[in-house]
Amino acid sequence: MKIIDWNQLDTAAQAQTLTRPAQTIATQTREAVAALIEQVRRGGDTALRDITARLDGVDLATFEVTAAELAAAATAVAPELQHAMQTAAARIEAFHRAGMTNGYRVETAPGVVCERLVRPIARVGLYVPAGSAPLFSTALMLGVPARLAGCREVVLCTPPSKDGRANPAVLLAARLTGVTRVFTLGGAQAIAAMAYGTASVPTCDKVFGPGNSFVTEAKQQLAQAGVVAIDMPAGPSEVLVIADAAANPAFIAADLLSQAEHGPDSQVLLLSDSDALMTAVQTALALQLQQLSRAEIARQALAQSRLIKVATLETAFDISNRYAPEHLILALRQPRAWLHRVAAAGSVFLGDYTPEALGDYCSGTNHVLPTGGAARAYSGVSVSSFQNMISVQAASRSGIAEIGDCALTLARAEGLDAHANAVALRMGTVP
């Protein structure tokens, strides 16, 4: 990673510096996903068996994990990992429970009462990937808020291993969080199955979870077609670090690499006003890379990442808000004093001893976050992601007499005579 001096760049070069790795979906991928979706829509379970055999190399008679298999999963997971998962789930629940939205009721005028009701989405689908490694942590991050929201049915799909079984840790996470049904299905076909429903897989109202380019494309296509709602735009993982001269370069290098190892299309950025720190981070990166099992993946990600020298930390925050990172680390001496400058980020990590990896696993916050700049308008998954907000209003005879003239004036100004008539008829019955 080379050091770039922000002040030496013109406007076009600055924009180019903040450009993320090209995320254009190849026409071939888009067409392949569309074909898979259509195959599942038309063929249901039969199509799912054919696709699973072709893409996963597994012949499955049934997709659903039995209650006995779920119960047995705990015996296949090491006690230390079980304890860690239980601890993480408890912290995730504590954080998400504290932020739950309550309904409210307010009288907006004499005789006019407006309310907001909070209702769970009836049936939700969770996707837990298992590419280079089964992400049982994602099952915790999605399953806990779904349970707190009160969803009647929570469906989870995760790819089968070569023996046709789901990963035991994923099954344990599903059991810990109260997931109601689990299916060994992966890829775009799993998303299509939850969106359209099959004889085995129930139709879901909303689908959550990360995945590869096929999963992401399937979610986008099905959402754009109005078939199913999705959690948020998805994309490769990213982190932006703002650091001062006193930050620990080894810590920063470790945080950058923890994101870079996700995939070659991940992006990491370091912004600092200290040349010495950035040089030290370069050295630390080279040393730590030698010890990583996924070093080659991390190197590819670092090749399209940036070390950006800024004149002031204020400028660093302006750049960060423009970039809107998924993860933002403030490696500063008084990080909380700078928090008011953060306007767009998925999740923020304060100080030298809050690595992003804590948020990935067990601090309690959710790691399913907006990427690709979507943090300017989207938030990470929360309990409210699994709920609907329903508005209610009730006007008495005196209430419509109180506000009816306002409605008549507005309706007539918009030329909507039927709207005006619906109010006027009622006002005519008020003594």
From Swiss-Prot:
Gene3D superfamilies attached to this UniProt entry: 1.20.5.1300, Nitrogenase molybdenum iron protein domain
GO biological process: L-histidine biosynthetic process
Annotated NAD(+) binding sites: Y127, Q189, N212
Cofactor note: Binds 1 zinc ion per subunit.
InterPro entries linked: Ald_DH/histidinol_DH (IPR016161), Histidinol_DH_CS (IPR001692), Histidinol_DH_monofunct (IPR022695), Hstdl_DH (IPR012131)
UniProt keyword annotations, A-Z: Amino-acid biosynthesis, Histidine biosynthesis, Metal-binding, NAD, Oxidoreductase, Zinc
Entry's EC annotation: 1.1.1.23
Function in brief: Catalyzes the sequential NAD-dependent oxidations of L-histidinol to L-histidinaldehyde and then to L-histidine.
Name the UniProt record assigns to this protein: Histidinol dehydrogenase
Species annotation: Xylella fastidiosa (strain 9a5c)
